From Swiss-Prot:
Keywords, in A-Z order: Metal-binding, Zinc, Zinc-finger
Gene expressing this chain: ZFAND4
Ubiquitin-like domain residues: 28-103
Zinc finger (AN1-type): 661-708
Protein name: AN1-type zinc finger protein 4
GO molecular function, one term: zinc ion binding
Length: 727
């Protein structure tokens, strides 16, 4: 304790460490030089770590520690070592190098064995030996620096002690170029050395993984486009095909022999149903539909649905020459084509004969028998208008064809007991052609019947009553027939085409019954005779019009039949009047199905009056034409009853005795059925439903403005006050 200047300690043994600690407190001056040449002085301790020195530089200059790199004797100082470890004494100069802001973009360690061999394609052939000089046990690090769109790669070897050295000891540049495809365009990666040496050298560009992915995406997109195109073609091919267009053709089966009655029954036309109904067999056919269709559609079952049925008119006429001569001779002498019908569809007289229904001939009455005993020289030929070849054929909505009833073989000499089947119309399924094709076909019934006075073409009610699903179709004719081109010769007798029952004892009654249909009972709302037209839907005859027709018929019975202008067929007259009433309706519910039966509005013709006139009657042929109304849409009469000039009369018709039927109201705009609470009558005079009852919804034609002015004028009359005398 001699030296009083020293502080006292507990013992003398601590003097050694005491001097050591005093030596630790010594400081020294260091000079820090930057790359720009700026130099500043820093006082540090020799036992201070490098990171503490960097912290002092950060406090002095504001440079972040992560960006500071101190280099002394070409060696970077580690953060964990002291200055004394590097033998840095007082007065030494340390170089301060600033790192890139944010650090390297990507640092990836690549083993030098196999991956570097695979990456040799990215290197020049002269630089492959650079990788061979390196040890396989060491790792190679790529320092990536970004300058705009250019990436600089600096390969270096990790020595394992935390230091990175260039891959080549010499100043040889180890740069290589990678071609990278980016989203915004192509950007080139240029290589450089650790010493910022940039030179232009040969490049080898290869598409990277992103480029390959883009190529694969384009290939996949092309495949998807091809697949979508194929799917679109498949969807187009799955669309329903158009209706198969079938031309009218004669029946396939040969005509029945003279002594057979059963084949004549089954050689009948199939009833063409409406859309939504099943094909029902012909009237009077006791066999299944397969047997009933055997005579008519034997050829149709052998042909495909997509092919047109070829006409076999020639073969059929060659097979039966007698029928051909008979039909052609009587057709040419009795029935002539109206001038409105073009001769384009009928190529020759054979097709003309096949297209016309020939119900009778001009043979003597003693040899005329219908369906009972048919002579070989006289064939009662019924030509089908069309056959249901496939279910895919879309038939237009037409009335069902009237069919033959059974004949009675016991009364061959006296006439017929059954009914004669009538081909009512010739159909075409190509309705999409604007109904131009039906204009070129004959649709008339040649009601030329010769024989006894009791021979009348009828439709027996007893044959029709068991078949609830078969309906009578109204007669059709393509053009109005005149008196001279539609009837037989004046010396021939003509028959009247009627509906009813035929009494064999020369007493006839015209009994028109109501044939109900199970399918039509659900949809038909009106009762009346409906007349089908080719261009429009069926129309309905009201009760008042039916009474008018009956009165006109009674008046016509007292006059000669030869007055053509005074007689109008009941269906054609009603069709022209009721068409104007129903033409403005828009709903489908207002218009009923085309094929429907005769209603009870024309029931119970007076049997006694008909019996009185039946022995002397020689009835006339009746023709109906809907061509004028269906095609032209005019308001003229649909057809005329054309009769031969004779002195005989039509039977008187009694007005139908029927109770009132409940009428239903429909909306004038949409056709919706309206009840008692949902019927609204507008001031324009029409009935509307709840949604269309307002004037702005149905376009009311009532002038509300003028009516309002009138009401205001009546409620508020103009009052002229008397002038007050001046005072």
């Amino acid at each position: 304790m001699d030296n009083r200047k020293e502080p006292p300690f507990f013992n003398d043994d601590n003097m050694g460490p005491f001097y050591y600690r005093l030596h630790f407190c010594d400081t020294m001056e260091l000079f820090i030089e930057t790359l720009t040449g700026t130099c500043f002085e820093l006082r540090v301790s020799p036992f201070e770590t490098v990171i503490s020195v960097k912290a002092k530089i950060r406090r002095l200059e504001g440079i972040p520690i992560c960006r500071q790199h101190l280099i002394w004797n070409n060696m970077e100082l580690e953060n964990d070592y002291c200055l004394n470890d590097y033998n840095i004494s007082e007065g030494c100069t340390l170089k301060l190098v600033l790192a890139m802001r944010g650090g390297p973009i990507n640092t990836r360690r690549v083993p030098t064995d196999d991956p570097l061999r695979k990456m040799a394609e990215y290197l020049d052939s002269s630089r492959v030996e650079v990788w061979e000089k390196t040890s396989c046990s060491k790792q190679v690090t790529f320092l990536v620096y970004q300058e705009g769109d250019q990436l600089n790669f600096f390969p270096a070897v990790d020595r394992g002690d935390g230091t990175l050295t260039p891959l080549s000891d010499s100043s040889k540049k180890i740069d290589f170029h990678l071609h990278v495809l980016r989203r915004k365009g192509e950007h080139r990666m240029s290589g450089g050395s650790m010493y910022n040496s940039d030179t232009d050298e040969d490049e080898e560009t290869e598409p990277s993984s992103s480029g390959q992915q883009i190529i694969e995406n384009s290939i996949t997109m092309n495949k998807m486009k091809l697949l979508k195109a194929k799917m679109k073609n498949m969807n187009l091919s799955k669309k329903p095909k158009k209706a198969v267009k079938i031309k009218p053709h004669p029946p396939v089966a040969p005509r029945p022999s003279s002594g057979s009655t059963a084949p004549s029954r089954h050689r009948l036309l199939r009833v063409l149903p409406n859309i939504g109904q099943s094909c029902s067999p012909a009237f009077g056919n006791a066999y299944p539909p397969e047997i009933s269709r055997n005579g008519i559609s034997s050829l149709a079952t052998q042909l495909s649905a997509e092919r047109y049925i070829s006409s076999i008119t020639g073969e059929f006429l060659k097979e039966d020459n007698s029928w051909e001569n008979n039909t052609l001779s009587h057709f040419s002498s009795n029935v002539k084509l109206p001038p409105q019908i073009p001769h384009l569809e009928l190529g020759n007289d054979q097709e003309l004969a096949d297209s016309v229904l020939h119900l009778g001939s001009s043979l003597p009455r003693q040899t005329k028998h219908f369906l009972g005993n048919l002579p070989s020289s006289n064939g009662n030929i019924v030509l089908p208008s069309e056959e249901c070849v496939t279910e895919q054929s879309l038939l237009p909505k037409v009335g069902s064809l009237a069919s033959f009833a059974e004949g009675n073989a016991d009364e061959q000499s006296s006439g017929l007991e059954g009914a004669c089947k009538v081909n009512l119309e010739l159909l075409l399924t190509n309705a999409d052609k604007g109904l131009k094709a039906p204009e070129q076909h004959l649709k008339h019934v040649a009601g030329v019947l010769n024989g006894e006075s009791v021979e009348t073409s009828v439709l027996n009610y007893r044959e029709l009553s068991p078949h609830k699903n078969r309906l009578l179709s109204p007669l059709r004719c393509s053009a109005p027939m005149s008196l001279h081109n539609s009837l037989v010769k004046p010396e021939r007798q003509s028959k009247c085409f009627e509906f009813g029952k035929l009494q064999p004892s020369s007493s006839q009654s015209l009994d028109v019954q109501n044939i109900t249909d199970s399918s039509f009972s659900r949809t038909t709302c009106f009762q009346g005779v409906k007349v089908d037209s080719l261009g429009k839907r069926s129309d309905v005859i009201s009760k008042v019009e039916a009474r008018d027709i009956t009165e006109m018929t009674n008046k016509a019975s007292k006059e000669p039949v030869g007055c053509v202008n005074n007689i109008s067929f009941l269906a054609s007259l009603a069709g022209s009047t009721s068409r104007n009433r129903l033409q403005s309706t828009r709903g489908a519910g207002r218009l009923q199905n085309s094929g429907t039966g005769l209603s009870t509005n024309l029931q119970h013709f007076q049997e006694e009056n008909f019996r009185k006139s039946s022995p002397q009657l020689e009835h006339t042929g009746v023709f109906l034409s809907t061509h004028g109304v269906g095609m032209n849409g005019n308001n003229a009469a649909a057809g005329k009853s054309v009769g031969e000039c004779t002195t005989h009369h039509l039977p008187p018709v009694k007005a139908p005795l029927q109770t009132k039927k409940k009428t239903t109201n429909h909306c004038f705009l949409c056709g919706k059925k309206t009840g008692l609470a949902s019927s609204y009558e507008c001031r324009c005079g029409n009935n509307f439903c709840a949604s269309h009852r307002y004037a702005e919804t149905h376009g009311c034609t009532y002038d509300y403005k003028s009516a309002g002015r009138r009401y205001l004028h009546e409620a508020n009359p103009v009052v002229n006050a008397p002038k007050l005398p001046k005072i």
